[in-house]
A protein has these predicted regions:
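An exposed tryptophan-centered "aromatic clamp" motif
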Residues: 75-88, 94-143, 149, 163
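Bacterial N-terminal signal peptides that target proteins for export
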Residues: 2-14
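Bacterial N-terminal signal peptides
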Residues: 12-22
C-alpha cells in the first residue's frame, strides 16, 4: 500500500510546482507591455528598445544585423537613438538588464516574444566592475549569467533603455 501512496504524493507535488511555476511566468510576463519598437517594463518603470542596436523593428520583428560595439562607440549609438526616436536613451544598469533574462528559456535566455532575434551573447551594462575597475559588467543571453570581466575595447551587443 505504501508503494502506491508515494507516487500519488509525488504527482501532487509536481502539479503544485507546475502551477507555481506557470503563475510565476505569467506574473513576470504581465510586467511587460509590447509597443512595436519598444517594450514597457512596468516593474522597473523603463522602456526597452525591442531590437538591439543595429537591427530595426520591421514586419513585427527585429530585422537586420545587430552591431557589436566597443564601449566608446556606444555614445554615438545613444545620440542617434535620441535623435531618431526621441527621449533620453541610455545603457541599462546591471539590475535592469538582468531583469529581462529568462532562465527557463531554451536557446536564448530572453523572452523572444518580447525581444525577437536577440543574439545569444553578451550585452553591455553601464556599470564598471568595482573590484576590477578596468572591466565592465555584461549580461550574457546564452547563459543568462552576468560577467564583470569585459574591458571597454572588446565589442559587445547593446540594448538601450529609457526611463518612463
Amino acid at each position: 500500500m505504501l508503494f502506491f501512496k508515494i507516487p500519488l504524493i509525488s504527482v501532487k507535488a509536481i502539479i503544485i510546482l507546475l502551477l507555481i511555476h506557470s503563475n510565476f511566468n505569467n506574473v513576470w510576463a504581465s510586467n511587460f507591455i509590447t509597443r512595436g519598437h519598444y517594450v514597457i517594463d512596468l516593474g522597473q518603470k523603463i522602456e526597452w528598445l525591442t531590437c538591439p542596436v543595429g537591427m530595426v523593428w520591421q514586419n513585427k520583428t527585429c530585422e537586420g544585423t545587430p552591431l557589436k560595439l566597443k564601449f566608446k562607440q556606444i555614445e554615438l549609438a545613444i545620440d542617434q537613438a535620441n535623435d531618431q526616436l526621441g527621449g533620453k536613451w541610455r545603457l541599462p544598469n546591471r539590475k535592469e538588464l538582468e531583469r529581462i533574462v529568462c532562465k527557463s528559456c531554451a536557446a536564448v535566455k530572453i523572452d523572444t516574444k518580447l525581444f525577437p532575434n536577440t543574439p545569444a551573447e553578451s550585452f553591455w551594462t553601464n556599470e564598471i566592475n568595482a573590484w576590477q575597475p578596468k572591466f565592465m559588467w555584461t549580461v550574457n543571453f546564452f547563459t543568462g549569467h552576468t560577467f564583470g570581466r569585459f574591458p571597454e575595447f572588446i565589442p559587445n551587443y547593446v540594448r538601450l533603455v529609457r526611463d518612463r
